[in-house]
């Protein structure tokens, strides 16, 4: 591997602006048969998304992926969303009971629009087998498979039938895979994304390591169709999880998907818990992301998201922030 870099090492280079106002720039993106307002999806984690937020996002035309940590609620969730005439997007694992679950959905003719196979190490026989099982039983569902970190993995999952792959092994803020195992894309997630995107023939979802809104534009530049974000979506008014007051400040809990807090036991722990500052309404963050991305498109010299894919960039090793803080 040469040219290894991460988000903070990269600066995109502006091109001549062709709009009078950033509001002319269109941030929408198509995934499967649908077009969404932003190329961003909140992480399918228990402290980030719940049924209420999923419904809100779908109504407002944002992409969502419901988490898989209360498997018994999934059928009701699909039925509810369909009753509201909203798109359905769920997660599954690879255990035996998930095979039965997929067969149940087919038998009941409950067909999710999107199914994400969500395991920490997605380059595995188990995931390939599950992709094929879903495609046999629910051929019209759009299958996202992950998580992976290599071009070989992307090719194998695409060849097995995945409609998109999710790239990122342990770069997330509450993920400690890199520390516990020695493996992962933490510290070079953006380079891994670029490497994987070059091999991909289908969409890629970049997952993890996003710390600023500018990182969304950088992900698009290096090949992502959609960007999954955890920590920036944590701690909102609507977010699941407790709000507590500490030193006169409101904070909320945020924990990783393989943490003991999510599992309820201390076994194979690869996630941790942290508290994040209370961020106010979710819509404020979504609106700010859209405006920042519109600005990114205007700096890229275009009117559509794709303009960002063609800009030049420089590698500035770990120096672009010079201690800058947005707040």
UniProtKB/Swiss-Prot annotation:
- Keyword Oxidoreductase recorded: yes
Q: Pfam families from the xrefs?
A: IMPDH
InterPro entries named among the record's database cross-references = Aldolase_TIM, GMP_reductase, GuaC_type_2, IMP_DH/GMP_Rdtase_CS, IMP_DH_GMPRt
GO CC, sorted alphabetically, is: cytosol; GMP reductase complex
The entry's family comment says: Belongs to the IMPDH/GMPR family. GuaC type 2 subfamily.
Q: From the UniProt record, which GO molecular function terms apply?
A: GMP reductase activity
Q: What is this protein called?
A: GMP reductase
GO BP terms in the entry: purine nucleotide metabolic process
Annotated keywords: NADP, Oxidoreductase
């Amino acid at each position: 591997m040469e040219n290894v870099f991460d988000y903070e090492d990269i600066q995109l280079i502006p091109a001549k602006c062709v709009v009078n106002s950033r509001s002319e720039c269109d941030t929408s993106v198509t995934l499967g048969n649908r077009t969404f307002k932003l190329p961003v999806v909140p992480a399918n984690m228990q402290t980030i998304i719940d049924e209420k937020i999923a419904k809100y996002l779908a109504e407002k035309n944002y992409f969502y992926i419901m988490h898989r940590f209360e498997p018994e609620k999934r059928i009701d969730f699909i039925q509810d969303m369909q009753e509201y005439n909203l798109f359905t997007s769920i997660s599954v694992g690879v255990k035996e009971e998930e095979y039965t679950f997929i067969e149940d959905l087919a038998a009941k003719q409950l067909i999710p629009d999107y199914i994400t196979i969500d395991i920490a190490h997605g380059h595995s026989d188990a995931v390939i087998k599950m992709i094929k099982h879903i495609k046999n039983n629910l051929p019209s569902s759009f299958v996202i498979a992950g998580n992976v970190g290599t071009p070989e993995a992307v090719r194998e999952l695409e060849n097995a039938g995945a409609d998109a792959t999710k790239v990122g092994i342990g770069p997330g803020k509450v993920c400690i895979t890199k520390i516990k195992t020695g493996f992962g894309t933490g510290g070079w997630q953006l380079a891994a994304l670029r490497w994987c995107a070059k091999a991909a023939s289908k969409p890629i979802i970049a997952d993890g390591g996003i710390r600023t809104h500018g990182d969304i534009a950088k992900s698009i530049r290096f090949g992502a169709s959609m960007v999954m974000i955890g920590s920036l979506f944590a701690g909102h008014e609507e977010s699941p999880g407790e709000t507590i007051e500490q030193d006169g400040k409101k904070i909320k809990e945020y924990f990783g998907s393989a943490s003991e807090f999510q599992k309820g036991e201390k076994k194979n722990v690869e996630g941790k818990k942290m508290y994040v500052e209370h961020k106010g309404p979710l819509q404020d963050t979504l609106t700010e992301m859209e405006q920042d991305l519109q600005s990114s498109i205007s700096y890229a010299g275009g009117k559509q998201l794709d303009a960002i894919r063609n800009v030049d960039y420089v590698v500035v090793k770990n120096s672009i922030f010079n201690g800058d803080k947005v707040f």
